[in-house]
């Protein structure tokens, strides 16, 4: 009986062997892989591809982000070199003039002795040309520095205002009202002092400032994150100022028509009206948040209701007149029916 030798390798093993023997034309033959060296990886493995990608990215280095303002300035400089040089010279001269007049106002050499005047003009005569040359030569550097300084300052102040407003509003709503009440008391005290005391201040200016400050404090109502937007703040501000403008127009007209019969000046009436309206709108918004945003809709609905009421009254009068025009015989026939 013959012993049949069955192969120990399966069809899958043969397929893998066939694939291993084939050479990829793009990658080339597989190099020998030393498994004893732990730092060596198969060249076509996924980890090797990832490491190669990371090394290529790190070798190229970080890409520098260009400022669009710098690009526009460079384009303008390349296209109009003469105009750009004149602008640099003009701005440099203006900066030197500002420095000169500032030093003149601070020192005031006309009140000094002859030696002081000579020292001042010699110092200015040496400093101003050096400053002009420095500003002109390093124009781009110091303009970028000044722009960056202004930007950082504005952002810092805006963040301070926002953080303060958020802290005030999130602490408790009643504290905001208490602070505003104290402010009203101070303004009202100034108003009384200017009217009956020896404080020589314009009453209209004081009360108008108080009412406008009410509009400015409305931004505390719109600081509830994430609804912090300038749109909400300015909408409340313009609505308050719009109502106050209407009050000013009405009071101006009344004082012009009835000036002889009103025992007060137009400025006092205007100031008092602005003062009352500003405080009323502030507290109304505090009690009903979003009331100022809904105010135009309420005004439109109120005007529509008023006009509709007038129309109903007119129709009622017309109906009554129509009934009065009915002949007496027709009324008797209708009553019999």
Swiss-Prot record:
Residues 1-29 have a biased composition (Basic and acidic residues). Residues 1-40 are annotated as: Disordered. Disruption phenotype: Sensitises cells to wtf4-encoded poison. The keyword Endoplasmic reticulum applies. Keywords: Cytoplasm, Endoplasmic reticulum, Membrane, Toxin, Transmembrane, Transmembrane helix, Vacuole. The keyword Transmembrane applies. Signal peptide: none annotated. GO terms for cellular component: ascus epiplasm; cytoplasm; endoplasmic reticulum membrane; membrane; perinuclear endoplasmic reticulum; vacuolar membrane; vacuole. Homomer. Forms protein aggregates. The two isoforms can interact with each other and with themselves. High sequence similarity is required for their interaction. This is Meiotic driver wtf4.
């Amino acid at each position: 009986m013959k012993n049949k030798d069955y192969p120990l390798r399966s069809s899958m093993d043969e397929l893998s062997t066939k694939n291993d023997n084939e050479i990829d034309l793009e990658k080339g033959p597989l190099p020998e892989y030393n498994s004893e060296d732990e730092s060596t990886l198969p060249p076509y493995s996924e980890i090797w591809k990832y490491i190669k990608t990371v090394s290529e990215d790190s070798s190229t280095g970080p890409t520098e982000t260009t400022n669009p303002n710098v690009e526009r300035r460079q384009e303008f400089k390349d296209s109009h070199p003469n105009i750009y040089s004149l602008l640099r010279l003009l701005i440099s001269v203006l900066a030197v003039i500002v420095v000169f007049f500032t030093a003149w106002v601070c020192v005031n050499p006309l009140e000094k002795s002859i030696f002081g005047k000579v020292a001042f003009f010699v110092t200015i005569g040496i400093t101003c040309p050096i400053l002009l040359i420095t500003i002109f030569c390093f124009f781009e550097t110091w303009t970028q520095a000044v722009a960056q300084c202004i930007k950082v300052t504005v952002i810092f102040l805006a963040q301070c205002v926002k953080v303060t407003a958020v802290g005030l509003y999130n602490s408790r709503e009643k504290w905001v009202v208490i602070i505003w009440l104290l402010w009203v008391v101070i303004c009202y005290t100034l108003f009384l002092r200017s009217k009956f005391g020896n404080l020589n201040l314009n009453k209209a200016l004081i009360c108008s400032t108080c009412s406008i400050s009410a509009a400015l404090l409305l931004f505390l109502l719109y600081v509830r994150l994430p609804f912090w937007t300038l749109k909400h703040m300015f909408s409340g501000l313009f609505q308050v100022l719009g109502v106050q403008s209407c009050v000013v127009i009405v009071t101006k007209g009344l004082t012009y028509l009835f000036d002889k019969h009103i025992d007060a000046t137009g400025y006092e009436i205007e100031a008092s009206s602005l003062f009352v309206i500003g405080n009323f709108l502030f507290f109304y918004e505090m009690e009903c948040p979003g009331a100022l945003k809904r105010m135009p809709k309420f005004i439109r609905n109120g005007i529509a209701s008023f006009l509709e009421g007038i129309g109903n009254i007119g129709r009622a009068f017309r109906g009554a007149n129509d009934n009065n025009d009915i002949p007496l015989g027709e009324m008797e026939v209708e009553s019999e029916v």
